[in-house]
Structure formats: structure tokens, C-alpha cells
């Protein structure tokens, strides 16, 4: 497991039901571009606004459509619900699950450890721990190291953490477990992650600009670092969409619409998609893509 993995948006119709036709179009588009994996029920996919049945239905439909590597997010505030969703993902043939630390209630380190341990003991499917302290309880590197060394099915981490020190410490876990995978969740950290010894990225801007991520990946693999750095600067510019929008999902969906993707400007309540002013700002930011060869 490596490379460019896309945390999918969840497209909705005007009545807030899941738009499975748009979902299928999007997955087909991304696989034709050559991404290395698809990830549903992600933060960008507004998983917290979906009920359990919808999350299972989305996971099932995504598995039917996706021909390549396929991940399902199974995070929740309830450890028992995580186990239920993880078993479901295993049953439908997902290649792995992504589990964020519980959110809303502040937890002690021992509780975070228990959460991941209980899930790992009850499923066989490969698990990626998701660290995103802006949205959930922070996951110390020591906990990630401990569970990855104790449980063979905990195979990696996705880190949406604005800290190169944290990222480097995660990559050092690979010295103790050679097959441990480290992915960044931040587009602007993609090249840095690869240079430090990481394995790829699970990045939201790849929903609408996978060509940039794939060109960075391919340039890095060819050791064309000059080209990779140039493209990384473009990706950093594109990442500014997060700064002008009110949420990841709003930023990415508006960027997709600006590029002509067949999705509707709808977020699940209570979230509201940003208006014309933000949309125009995002269109301006995306002009940096115009000079990049596909």
C-alpha cells in the first residue's frame, strides 16, 4: 500500500440523499487517472453526517465500483460501533480500514490505546490509524508505535498533523517494523513525507487534481527532485482552498464544481456550502493549475 490515495467526497442530491451516480462517475474518473487507492467515509466525505446504515451502504457501493485498492473509514465516538463498521468493511471485501481516534469527548492516553487495541483484537482486516488533532483526540506517537508493534493488522498511520517532527517520529517506527506505512493527510506535506521516508498521501485535493499528486509521486520515483519540488509548490498553492472555505468538504466540492465535475453544491446539515465569494476565491486559486501539463 503506497502512493496517492483519495479520501472521497460524498456527493449528495438536493434532498440530501447520497448521489450514487455522481459517486460512480467520480471513482471511475480517479481510477482512469491512475490513483493508487480509493477511501470512502472519510472526513472530506462528511462521514459524521451519515448514519450507520448509510455508511454501510456507501461502503458497499464503493466496493462494487472500485476495481483497485479500497479503504473504508470506520471511525466513531463509540468503540463498539467502530467494531461493527470494521467487521462490515471486512465482510464486503475492503482492503483496509481507516480509524480516527474518538472525537467530542477528551480521552486519556490509556483510553485511546484501549480503543485501538479493542478494534485490532476483533477484526483481521488491515487497519490504518488516523491522527487528526484538529478534529479528534490527538494520538501520541508512542501509542501508534505500541499498537503497531503489538498488532500485526495495524499496518500504518494517516497523519493530518501540521508538524514535521511528528511526521518524522512516525516514520522512525518503520525502523522497528519494516512494513509499517506512513501517509500524510496534508497535500502540502506530500513531497516532504516521501523525502523523509514515508509511503504516500491520503489527500483531499486529489479529488479534483489527482494529476498533480501523481506527477509528484512519479517524479519522486524517478528521482527527478527538481520537477517534484516545482509541482509541490503548485500543490501548496492549491491547498490554500482550505484557508478560504469553512470546511474541507466545502472547499473540495467547490473546487470540483469549478473544474466542471458533475456534483451538486450540497453538504449534509448542519454544514452549509460556502457561497459565491468563496467560490470565486477558489476559482482564482485553481488558476495555478492552468500551466501544469497533464
Swiss-Prot record:
GO biological process, one term: small molecule metabolic process
Keywords on record: Cytoplasm, Lyase, Schiff base
Chief location: cytoplasm
Enzyme Commission code: 4.-.-.-
Active site positions, chain numbering: 43 (charge relay system), 104 (charge relay system), 130 (proton donor), 158 (schiff-base intermediate with substrate)
Family note: Belongs to the DapA family.
Protein name as catalogued: Uncharacterized DapA-like lyase PYRAB12600
Annotated organism of origin: Pyrococcus abyssi (strain GE5 / Orsay)
The gene coding this protein: dapAL
Amino acid at each position: 500500500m503506497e502512493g496517492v490515495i483519495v479520501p472521497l467526497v460524498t456527493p449528495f442530491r438536493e434532498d440530501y440523499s447520497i448521489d450514487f451516480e455522481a459517486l460512480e462517475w467520480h471513482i471511475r474518473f480517479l481510477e482512469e487517472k491512475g490513483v493508487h487507492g480509493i477511501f470512502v467515509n472519510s472526513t472530506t466525505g462528511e462521514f459524521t453526517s451519515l448514519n450507520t446504515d448509510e455508511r454501510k451502504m456507501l461502503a458497499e457501493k464503493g466496493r462494487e465500483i472500485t476495481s483497485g485498492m479500497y479503504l473504508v473509514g470506520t471511525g466513531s465516538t463509540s468503540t463498539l460501533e467502530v467494531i461493527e463498521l470494521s467487521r462490515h468493511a471486512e465482510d464486503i471485501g475492503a482492503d483496509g480500514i481507516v480509524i480516527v481516534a474518538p472525537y467530542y469527548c477528551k480521552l486519556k492516553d490509556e483510553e485511546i490505546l484501549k480503543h485501538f487495541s479493542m478494534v485490532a483484537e476483533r477484526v483481521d482486516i488491515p487497519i490504518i490509524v488516523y491522527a487528526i488533532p484538529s478534529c479528534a483526540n490527538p494520538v501520541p506517537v508512542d501509542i501508534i508505535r505500541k499498537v503497531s508493534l503489538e498488532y500485526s493488522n495495524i499496518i500504518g498511520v494517516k497523519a493530518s498533523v501540521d508538524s514535521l517532527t511528528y511526521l518524522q517520529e512516525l516514520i522512525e517506527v518503520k525502523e522497528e517494523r519494516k512494513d509499517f506505512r506512513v501517509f500524510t493527510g496534508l497535500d502540502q506535506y506530500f513531497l516532504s513525507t516521501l523525502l523523509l521516508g514515508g509511503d504516500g498521501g491520503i489527500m483531499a485535493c486529489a479529488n479534483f487534481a489527482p494529476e498533480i499528486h501523481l506527477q509528484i509521486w512519479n517524479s519522486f520515483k524517478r528521482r527527478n527532485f527538481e520537477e517534484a519540488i516545482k509541482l509541490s509548490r503548485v500543490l501548496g498553492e492549491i491547498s490554500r482552498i482550505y484557508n478560504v472555505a469553512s470546511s474541507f468538504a466545502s472547499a473540495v466540492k467547490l473546487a470540483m464544481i469549478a473544474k466542471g465535475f458533475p456534483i451538486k453544491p450540497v453538504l449534509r446539515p448542519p454544514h452549509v456550502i460556502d457561497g459565491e465569494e468563496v467560490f470565486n476565491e477558489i476559482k482564482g486559486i485553481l488558476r495555478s493549475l492552468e500551466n501544469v501539463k497533464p
